[in-house]
Amino acid sequence: MTFVPLSPIPLKDRTSMIFLQYGQIDVLDGAFVLINKTGIRTHIPVGSVACIMLEPGTRVSHAAVHLAATVGTLLVWVGEAGVRVYSSGQPGGARADKLLYQAKLALTEDLRLKVVRKMYELRFREPPPARRSVEQLRGIEGSRVRQTYALLAKQYGVKWNGRKYDPKDWEKGDVVNRCISAATSCLYGISEAAVLAAGYAPAIGFIHSGKPLSFVYDIADIIKFDLVVPKAFEIAARQPAEPDKEVRLACRDIFRSSKLTGKLIPLIEEVLAAGEIEPPQPAPDMLPPAIPEPETLGDSGHRGRG
């Protein structure tokens, strides 16, 4: 039998995400499995998932992390209901040319403004006002976002006192804020997987800054009111017994029906292309790789075969 080396498949061909909790994650007989306390194994198709959210109660073996990295699947360790990210394994972001391109766009003020204006246009489906700084555009954006929250609350008959929650005390927040937090966390997970698969850095943002996922927030904010926030209000209006669980399942279905995994990388490239520059070429005196990376079917940011 011929052995076929493992390699990533494109993000567009993957399921968006799954959540795992209460079990040991390991590789047995070559398969990525979750083993519960009674010893029952659940096979996880790790190579066909963009992002695996690991909730409290999970333990992960070295072999499982290695396999996930080899096939380009993002592992994210999260808190209760997936709303607090503790750490993540980065299977992508492996393109120096794209990282330098992203950094130049973020550090050059006029280029950054072009990118931010494009984000505004995509988010609100209209060109931003002319002759506005990034700070001014952020102010306009913030006002429109608050109005959108208020309109959604009115539409679904939900009491709304503003966007606020305590990440250290999940149960303290009201139902609608918990639903929104759970929904946006799902979107952040799949958005981070896309940023890494495309070869970029999650931390180098254009509107957000100072966070490990600044660029992820930038990208997710473009689409969150089209996809997940209305669903969060809809679920909150029903007052279900387990709102966060319902939100996660609904987000999974939305991501599948909207084919989001196939749209995120083109969205990222469209946003950055607004800067109207080309990715930098290596300096003439730089050494090429001694051992070139093998060609794979994966996206440009994936690290290839392990």
Mark where each language-model region is.
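Active-site helix-to-loop segments that bind/position phosphate- or nucleotide-bearing substrates
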Residues: T2-L6, D13-R14, Y22-G23, K37, ...
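Glycine/small-residue-rich interface belts in oligomeric ring/scaffold proteins
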Residues: N36, I40, I44-A96
